[in-house]
Amino acid sequence: MIFLTLEHILTHISFSVVSIVITIHLINLLVNEIVGLYNSSEKGMIVTLFCITGFLIIRWIYSGHFPLSNLYESLIFLSWNFSIINMLPYLKNLKNHLREITSPSTLFIQGFATSGLLTQIHEQKILVPALQSQWLMMHVSMMILSYASLLCGSLLSIALLVITFRKSRSVVGKRNKFLNRIFSNIQYINEREKILLKTSFTYSINYYRSHLLQQFDFWSYRIISIGFLFLTIGILSGAVWANEAWGSYWSWDPKETWAFITWTIFAIYLHIREKKNAEGVKSAIVASIGFLIIWICYFGINILGIGLHSYGSFPIS
């Protein structure tokens, strides 16, 4: 009973803290960056990380096995991975927009995990025979690590596409209208001053947008590369485990099939990135497709509850 109470407290503290952190990020987006608020958001994510870590440790001690036996535990572990990724810029003493991606992801995943939809699988149960193996921790942890990394990298690619398309469509039009309105009101200024004003204004916007796109592209590529490595290790370890449990390395189970599709999509992404001048839109489109594929592989199969991996599903009725 004590363990369950502690789990309940830690999950709700972490959820509340992440909510506050996201509010701080929104304030920073609406007004000029406030150093005190930025530091508070960093400390808030540290608190969240410790709370989720405490939850996993308590769950591990209470159950006697690593907490990755069902969808609820894997979602908490997934949010823990997002918290780890969120801390990477902090450890390197960098300020970028990675937290605007990871913080809402942590909130969404943990909010869903602690919602009423999964109450039936919150309680600990005896592991089914197929999961009573030393491969549980190796295989499932690698897969969840890969999901977290690939989802984060894909979200950065989606953000890159949104900014790029806004730049090519709406932003240019709005900027031209704004400049035309300015120039109509300052006709008395000489031509040299007009050109200087236009150049300065356009350059400042383009420089900020270009820097933002470079950051998204930089972090997206590196996080996806790490996630692809985790995914490869997870699939290989899963094949070895499957051979021990079911007598076959590969059965084209729905989960295995979609894991292979996910691996193929991000292999294509990395192949595109190997080409010269491949940064930007083309690879980001592939990563965006991969974002949907990951959710089908991870979550969609659990909803259907079919195949050899159905023990990780939850009832939807």
UniProtKB/Swiss-Prot annotation:
DNA-binding in keyword set: no
Subcellular location: Plastid, Chloroplast thylakoid membrane
MF term (GO), any: heme binding
Primary location class: plastid
Transmembrane segments: 17-37, 44-64, 71-91, 101-121, 143-163, 223-243, 252-272, 284-304
InterPro entries: Cyt_c_assembly, Cyt_c_biogenesis_CcsA, Cyt_c_biogenesis_CcsA/CcmC
HAMAP family named among the record's database cross-references: CytC_CcsA
Subunit structure: May interact with Ccs1.
PANTHER family, alphabetized: CYTOCHROME B_B6 PROTEIN-RELATED, HEME EXPORTER PROTEIN C
Known role: Required during biogenesis of c-type cytochromes (cytochrome c6 and cytochrome f) at the step of heme attachment.
Protein name, entry field: Cytochrome c biogenesis protein CcsA
Source species: Pelargonium hortorum (Common geranium)
